[in-house]
Regions:
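N-terminal subdomain of nucleotide-sugar transferases
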Residues: 1-53, 357-358
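Conserved donor-binding/catalytic core segment of Leloir-type glycosyltransferases
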Residues: 9-11, 186-203, 207-214, 225
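A conserved mid-protein helix/loop that constitutes part of the nucleotide-sugar donor-binding site
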Residues: 26, 30-33, 198-217, 231-237
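Carbohydrate-associated surface elements
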Residues: 156, 176
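Nucleotide-activated donor-binding/catalytic signature segment of Leloir-type glycosyltransferases, i.e.
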Residues: 237-255
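Short alpha-helical donor nucleotide-sugar binding micro-motif in glycosyltransferases
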Residues: 254-255, 262-267
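Aromatic "clamp/platform" in nucleotide-sugar-dependent glycosyltransferases that forms part
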Residues: 275
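Short hydrophobic beta-strand element within catalytic cores of glycosyltransferases
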Residues: 283, 288, 292-295
């Protein structure tokens, strides 16, 4: 029996397979690690539905992880995963003093987590991360969440969910950064423009390359780096070569999160032409690293310092050229939110529900 300490259960589609896996959902793993570090008296348990591809429980930075090895294998497999999650939680509820559940994404984790919370009379919140606020999310009607049960990662996501489903999340909690992950040593900004993210159509790295081609007309020696992997890689390599930019753009192989942060601290601009985002963690990280951020949207109603919101590719090009043309561009660090504050704000919701006073 482990009734001597409160237990906090997190339901998430995937989770790092080990402590060396820094590329799997960087923000959720930073949140979980910081939560456990901040509150050592709290027993944090993670239920990972689809990944890792294993069913063997393991420990990760002091957190117990139960993987259910769903592997995104289809409807029957998904139903079996849900049944196993339900069974595991039933056993856990008998042995632990469960304070609440946190579901990442308004999807299957929210469906099962909300069901379990209502069944056992526990507080639960679902954290909207991005794509789950768009039209066509069948889980919204299945979960039927109340506004008070929803946390949006940004003002944009709160507005998007309300526009599509007439539900406005009562809470907005943004992703924080961990200052300890950044080097304190001042570094020369030898990279003009950096792009960070999966190489998928949604991220629009074809536009990134087009912008670099435009910048090269003013700055022929412009230096750009793309960090990411994905199905668009070969097509993007072809585009780089066809544009004659092979000397200007480095398309790196898979890069660790620590290496990405180091590259950000050496970069002048994060260029993020994605067509849709919730709150890109790379925005917060790049701003803290001292880079300016240029993109097509703002996650919050009021842009942060050094964040430039543009409406077209032409405006994006002009803003980038303008920043690179300045002799004394300000590269001071901008803190959007610390990860410690993010964790505290989430736990405050459960505290308000009486989870930690019972």
């Amino acid at each position: 029996m482990e009734k001597d300490k409160k237990t906090f259960v997190i339901l998430i589609p995937g989770f790092p397979a080990n402590e060396q896996d820094g590329t799997c959902l960087p923000f959720p793993q930073l949140f979980v690690k910081t939560l456990q570090k901040q509150h050592p008296a709290l027993k944090v348990i993670v239920f990972a539905f689809q990944y890792p591809f294993s069913s063997v429980p393991y420990h990760w930075h002091g957190v117990t992880v139960y993987p259910f090895n769903g592997r995104e294998r289809g409807k029957l497999s998904r139903l079996f995963v849900w049944w196993r999650v339900n069974r595991k939680f039933r056993k856990m509820a008998r042995a632990h003093d469960v304070a609440g559940l946190l579901n990442f994404w308004l999807g299957e984790c929210s469906l099962i987590g909300t069901y379990l919370a209502r069944k056992y009379g526990l507080p639960a919140f679902t954290w909207l991360m991005g794509q789950d606020a768009r039209q066509g999310n069948r889980y919204v009607n299945r979960v039927k969440p109340t506004a008070g049960e929803l946390i949006a990662l940004s003002d944009f996501l709160a507005d998007e969910l309300h526009r599509n489903y007439r539900i406005r999340p009562a809470h907005v909690i943004v992703p924080g950064v961990d200052a300890a992950e950044f080097s304190m040593r001042k570094q020369a900004r030898t990279i003009d423009i950096i792009g960070v993210g999966s190489l998928i159509t949604l991220k629009r790295y074809d536009v990134f390359i087009e912008i670099i081609a435009g910048v090269a007309k003013t700055f022929p020696q412009v230096k750009a780096v793309i960090c990411g992997k994905g199905p668009e890689r070969d097509r993007l390599i072809d585009q780089i070569w066809n544009a004659g930019l092979q000397a200007n753009i480095d398309l790196l192989d898979e890069t660790t999160h620590a290496e990405v942060l180091c590259l950000m601290q050496r970069s002048k601009i994060l260029l993020h032409p994605s067509s849709y985002e919730g709150f890109p963690t790379v925005y917060a990280e790049a701003l803290y690293a001292g880079a300016h951020v240029v993109g097509f949207f703002s996650p919050m109603r009021h842009p942060f310092a050094h964040q430039h919101v543009v409406a077209s590719k032409e405006e994006m090009l002009n803003v980038v050229v303008n920043i690179l043309s300045r002799e004394n561009t300000d590269h001071a660090s901008v803190l959007t939110c610390s990860i410690e504050e993010t964790c505290s704000r989430v736990l405050a919701l459960y505290d308000s529900a009486g989870s930690f006073s019972k």
